[in-house]
Amino acid sequence: MRQLDYKGSVLLKSCLLGVFSCNSSATFFIEKHISLIMIRTYIAANRDRFLEEWASLIRIPSVSCQPAHKEDMLLCAKRWCELLLEAGAQKAEIMPSKGHPFVYAEYTASTQNDNIPTVLVYSHYDVMPVEPLDLWHSNPWEPDIREGRLYARGADDDKGQAMIQVKAFEYLVKHGLMNCNVKFIFEGEEEIGSPSLDTFLKEHKELLACDIILVSDTSMIGKETPSITTGLRGLAYWEIEVIGPNRDLHSGHFGGAVKNPINALTEMLAKVVDTDGRITIPGFYDDVLPIPQEERDMIKQIPFSEEAYCQAIDVDCTFGEAGYSTLERNSCRPSFDICGIWGGYTGEGSKTVLPSKAYAKVSCRLVANQDHEKVSQAFADYIQSIAPAGVRVTVTPMHGGQGYVCPIDIPAYKAAEHGFEVAFGKRPLAARRGGSIPIISSFEQILGVKTILMGFGLEKNAIHSPNESMDLEVWESGIVAVTEFYKALSGTL
């Protein structure tokens, strides 16, 4: 059967709407499904061009953490400006920062409605280094399509997902269907912690004013289980130094008479979490909000096998705060972890010493409503309060960020939910993630608006690793989902 071209789909839509114009429910059904045919037809007709434009970005090694790629960062920013203008942006420019530049673009809808929403699309054009190169099965800077997946650095994170946003925008603008104002802000330092972003947001707060922020830089639960990320955990991180004697001592001459810094450190850290998995820092849970029952019910719908989870990481059982499931504990509840610990002699053979110093790096994953600076100070105070005599303890905060939760009853979330349902054929689950993206809380604190995380990654995509890839079927469905998001948000379904 010959594939319906775009003009043919438009004609079919007009004919069917004419036939069913007297039946509102039938009209809605026809409108919805013909619109889906039209966007998928457009994607198919322009697929080769889309892939080549995507490839033109991937071929630029925009590795933000390596000074040797400084010129590549600028080249990538310029290429994004070109692509945004070609897609229909009325303005696109490179804006400097203390680090790598930002790309800013905008589109103002031509409509008589003064109350149309303004969407700010955020992405990043920098990528992680590709090393170790010998583990790649193809050139990381030259896209290679194998078995329905595109392999390259940035295939997913985040050049591939950014292209989803831009191609959905292109379709709507080219066909007179974009009834939202749209602004784009692409940064070049996300992979190094976005050191310039907060300053940029504050300096250009008026320029970036919007009603909602849209980000595609997260993942779905699975290809058959679409989901919207509705929450991220915050982070607090410290280094602890414990100092005892002025030098490493002979454990036979001094053991039992002088406090061992490593013993002291492990004693203190062992007190931070009790046998029920509760964190014992005074006041730690004061700002922790309960998980809404509606969300707990949604979490139960997520396909999850405790046995398979344990087998995948080769442990006998899970552990955590009593009264919560594993999925609740690693996404909606705070946690404490010792990330590294060292001191004394760790070389070959044995050396009987009582070490003079001990160190640990520790972190807390926080949840929305917890302030990372407040928690950071509370932890430092607690450690000092339980420090034993005979050692000196220093707690140094490293970095941190706020958690984030997106309400699932706001219009923008409902629009995203609709987009996923149309594109993937089923209602997406609302799913919090255990990781942290500090920039999301920066958006809320500085710009005063919520963020919708419409991510289309999969665990299999191996972001940050050799052989990063993107499922092309999911990628195309992502374009459909974002297209439908805009239509739903502007009320033009």
Sequence positions of predicted segments:
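Acidic/histidine-rich catalytic neighborhood of metal-dependent amide-processing enzymes
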Residues: 150, 156-231, 490-493
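Acidic, glycine-rich active-site loops and adjacent beta-strand->loop/helix elements
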Residues: 125-127, 185-194, 216-220, 244-246, ...
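An extended, acidic, His-containing surface patch that forms the Zn2+-binding/catalytic region
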Residues: 222-223, 280-357, 365-381, 386, ...
